């Protein structure tokens, strides 16, 4: 969002232009922001949510811009779950592939247990953790997405709405939040 530099001198974006970003977390029941962080526009989306903390057992649904191993570690240490699109160049090892139902209407195309590999995963301390990698058909857009999660049932119940709108479903006692 563009702002006037003479009023918001802290929000310098370019030499003669000011800008801010509003990083939000949406409450899944009310669809209203429950956490807001206003920052200068040059701060990355990922860094804009560093201070977001959620109640235990929250399922946090993030877009690929928040795909960050240290963020994953933080979410797991806070006893929360994550669902996010996996980056195409992510180094991982497939440990086990799960059978899928014979139902042709089933939108999950692949479900596997994985371990993240590489120096970045090792440095973040998540190289020994088990994740699920799920390939999902997003019917509204006619394309596949590849997701990584710590709670596979959450992905299955929430995935339809990750990119089609801002409504996220609850699973069990956990609630789903979206950082945007």
Describe the function of each predicted region:
Residues 2-180:
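Single, function-defining residue in the core of a domain
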